[in-house]
Amino acid sequence: MAVLGYEKVKKFATDAHRGQKRKYTDEDYITHPIAVANLVHARYEDDNMTCAALLHDVLEDTTVTHSELRAFLHKTFSVESAEDILSLVVDLTDVYTKEAFPDYNRKQRKAFEGLRLAYASKRAKQIKKADIEHNSESILEHDPKFAKVFLAEKVQLMSYMFN
């Protein structure tokens, strides 16, 4: 893939997700961000979006901090690209998590997350759509019972994001 900075971003994301596995398949977790990045690149051919797709779970699911990610991006890209990628990753990072909002049930957290994403940039929403598509394939194949719940949540999320 001829994307500016892609290999450095891929290494950073791979290192950040080291030891994490995909639910159901036990594959290295990094296979998911790579698949999302491939979908995004094929559809939009936007280097910054592709790199953000690779990093979309780094702040949410790893020990990497906002400051560490910003420093890495500023070493790798122009200031403009670094801030663009960082902004996309922040938009894609769940705020309404179980840890941050323990008094909210799953349905409430997902609804608030949908409302938050309604105000995300169009490009962040396009990455999120690719993320949902890739996760949906895996869940449909490996956990049809949970897929009913998951897909209903994602239909609701998409209605917030694109209406």
Regions found by a protein language model. Give the residues of each.
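Active-site helical microenvironments for divalent-metal-assisted chemistry
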Residues: 1-163
